[in-house]
Design a protein with these regions (language model features):
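Phosphate-handling catalytic cores of nucleic-acid transaction enzymes
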Residues: 1-399
């Protein structure tokens, strides 16, 4: 994942983490990208042809003991610590409230209201609780699971709640309205629900189950999938004592933005995005695979959302208070988006390489990956086929 367009402070944080823990750089770089976007929440928005906040759904892929979990855990620890403090305050206020309610009615403080728990991270929950949680924290909540497989398995666990279709609509911030018997109705005008977690490569096929390849769920995921994720030798190096604390301060700078920032694209950024959009549309039109068409369609959106994220990085690190996304920021966002195009193709190969999936055009993927400059060896490895087969397909495709 390219980080050359990140501020120097964040590049230093990423490189220090890699030096100490010997994990693929993609894992920590993506974790920085995601935690930055989540810290921004709904407070910075691009108001252009379409409105976009940096809403990301991220899937970090790696083998067991590859180090895929810890980088995101470190970057998200800021929010977990905030939740811990908030929960302790909630318990204290709940105790006071219950004590007050035990008094005779005439002696109660009539102005005292039942406390609420403000939280960022959602792990184990029932689907109908999300709107209630979100109504308390309207700047953004995150469904965060170490293993997304467990989260996917939970779909339908609660009386066929339709959680999957609800999640699909929240990606584009469609209103959420929950009405339940004996419950107060909840309405969320513009949901801001982030998603992050990990998955092992051999379990990727589960992503496509229950119609998720066809209904657009799979194409909404940004996949972090480094080429090498083997467990590395032990390193005696340690992070500097203030490294994580300083990163928390960085996230706090974004999390505590009070007044919403509304952005526009500079002329240069708009030209860059327009040119890239047209190239992306051409690639989509030339592809016959439904899943990949869906991916390319979401990349249009993600390029802008990532641009807002990069803007937030520069706002805090470089004190860039302009309310325009400039050409440099857009170029960085496009480069990162292209990384996620490549990983989507890699995921496609892992999920759909089974010969039983006859309806899916593997040859089209081979030709397309070759057009991106991937070697025959890399293509064969990604699709789990022989290099001679790749060579044969490319020879026929070039005739």
């Amino acid at each position: 994942l390219p980080i050359e367009g990140f501020p120097q402070y964040l590049q230093g944080f990423i490189n220090e983490y890699v030096d100490v823990y010997n994990v693929p750089r993609d894992y920590i770089a993506a974790s920085v990208l995601f935690s930055t976007a989540f810290a921004i929440g709904s407070r910075i928005e691009l108001n252009d042809k379409y409105d976009n906040i940096p809403l990301l759904w991220m899937n970090i892929i790696g083998n067991v003991s590859s180090g895929k979990t810890e980088p995101l855990s470190v970057c998200m620890s800021y929010f977990n610590e905030k939740d811990k403090v908030s929960f302790n305050e909630f318990k204290m206020r709940s105790s006071l409230y219950e004590s007050e309610m035990e008094k005779p009615k005439k002696e109660r403080d009539t102005f005292l209201q039942a406390p609420s728990y403000f939280q960022y991270i959602i792990n184990d929950y029932t689907p109908e609780t999300i709107p209630s949680i979100h109504s308390i924290n309207n700047r953004g909540v995150c469904i965060y699971r170490d293993e997304l497989k467990g989260w996917l398995d939970d779909f339908g666990r609660y009386n066929k709640s339709g959680e999957q279709s609800t999640m699909l609509s929240t990606f584009y911030r469609q209103p959420m309205q929950i009405n339940r018997a004996s419950k107060v109705p909840v309405y969320i005008d513009k949901p801001c629900i982030y998603l992050a977690g990990g998955m092992q490569p051999e379990l990727l096929v589960d992503l496509a189950k229950d119609n998720r390849a066809e209904n657009g769920f799979l194409s909404r995921l940004l996949n972090v999938f480094p080429d090498a994720d083997t467990k590395q030798p032990y390193s005696k190096d340690k992070l500097n004592a203030d490294t994580v604390a300083n990163y928390h301060k960085y996230l706090s700078g974004l999390d505590t933005i009070r007044d919403a920032i509304n952005l526009t694209l500079s002329k240069q950024a708009e030209v860059m995005y327009s040119d890239w959009y047209d190239r992306n549309a051409e690639q989509s039109n030339n592809n016959s695979t439904g899943y990949l068409k869906g991916v390319y369609g979401k990349l249009d959106v993600y390029a802008l959302r990532i641009a807002v994220t990069i803007y937030g990085m520069n706002l805090i690190c470089n004190q860039n208070t302009s309310e325009e996304i400039d050409g440099t920021t857009m170029r960085t966002a496009i480069n990162i988006t292209e990384y996620f195009r490549a990983t989507a193709l890699k995921v496609y190969g892992k999920i759909f390489s089974d010969s039983k999936s006859k309806s899916l055009n593997k040859k089209a993927v081979i030709i397309y990956m070759s057009s991106l400059g991937k070697s025959q060896s890399d293509i064969a490895k990604a699709l789990n086929v022989g290099q001679s087969y790749v060579s044969q397909v490319l020879k026929k495709g070039n005739k």
